[in-house]
């Protein structure tokens, strides 16, 4: 074992320190750039207390560009390797993704894209952070000016409380309380193909306890459950639900 005092395993050599866990804050995009996977493996084996919080925040490339975040392919690759290493050491560990709605640049179509991504990958977030402006961030600059300060091009900003509610509801499309908002959002975006009982539909044809809506799209019979599998379909995550704490206050990304 290397003897560098800065190596991750050095933490385990400190007298009186039994465990050191990283709950969040990992820059997974930087981690993927390291050709040496020893830190990644150390992290998974010794420094995760059941679940690790990471921040893909969105899946739309246009929105992620405004956030200054890597594209979703980086998160997918991180997830794949995380669960591969977890399986190799025979542990049951989870990823808890931070997600954000209504960030400057996020239109209704982007929120629908994210909802479809979550459904496809069996992710059901218990908490979603709606964007709100805080001083000193590029995102806040875009929120108030409706301009990208780097290009001076116009940026769409959802400021109306109802428009923001539509985007937020889509990220929790599976919650019956969000049915009316999701239905309105999908109709407004002309995506009635996502209303029905088909495997790709986000919401059923009828609201809970209501009548079927013959304007909906999906035709396949049966319903789809979300199993909470990791991105990429790794069956290491067997469907047990990890209990998640509220995200707290998250704001626009600082540059």
Which functions belong to the PLM regions below?
Residues 40-49, 116-132:
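Structural recognition of alpha->loop->beta junctions
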Residues 1-96, 100-104:
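Conserved SAM/AdoMet-binding glycine-rich loop
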Residues 169-213:
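Amphipathic alpha-helical packing elements
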Residues 13, 24, 84, 120, ...:
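Ordered, helix-dominated protein-protein interaction surfaces in large eukaryotic regulatory proteins
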Residues 30-33, 57-69, 89-110, 122-162:
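Flexible glycine/acidic-rich beta-alpha junction loops that bind and position SAM and/or redox cofactors
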Residues 54, 128, 190:
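Conserved, mostly hydrophobic/aromatic
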Residues 202-255:
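Acidic, low-complexity intrinsically disordered tails
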Residues 6-11, 24, 159, 164-181, ...:
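C-terminal accessory/binding modules appended to enzymatic or scaffolding proteins
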């Amino acid at each position: 074992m290397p003897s560098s005092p800065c190596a991750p395993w050095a933490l385990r050599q400190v007298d009186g320190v039994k465990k050191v866990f990283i709950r969040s804050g990992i820059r997974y995009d930087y981690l993927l750039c390291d050709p040496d996977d020893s830190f990644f493996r150390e992290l998974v084996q010794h420094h995760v207390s059941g679940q690790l919080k990471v921040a893909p925040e969105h899946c739309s490339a246009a929105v992620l560009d405004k956030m200054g975040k890597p594209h979703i392919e980086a998160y997918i690759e991180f997830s794949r390797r995380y669960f591969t290493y977890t399986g190799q050491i025979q542990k049951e560990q989870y990823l808890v993704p931070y997600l954000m709605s209504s960030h400057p640049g996020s239109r209704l179509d982007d929120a629908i894209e994210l909802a479809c991504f979550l459904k496809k990958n069996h992710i059901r977030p218990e908490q979603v952070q709606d964007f709100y402006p805080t001083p000193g961030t590029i995102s806040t600059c875009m929120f108030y000016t409706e301009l990208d300060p780097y290009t001076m091009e116009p940026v769409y900003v959802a400021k109306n409380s109802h428009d923001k509610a539509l985007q937020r509801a889509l990220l929790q499309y599976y919650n019956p309380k969000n049915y009316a908002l999701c239905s309105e959002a999908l109709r407004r975006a002309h995506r009635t193909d996502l209303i029905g009982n088909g495997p790709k539909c986000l919401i059923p044809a009828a609201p809970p306890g209501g009548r079927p809506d013959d304007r909906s799209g999906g035709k396949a019979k049966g319903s789809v459950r979300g199993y909470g599998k990791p991105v990429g379909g790794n069956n290491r995550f067997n469907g047990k639900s990890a209990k998640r704490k509220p995200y707290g206050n998250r704001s626009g990304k600082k540059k």
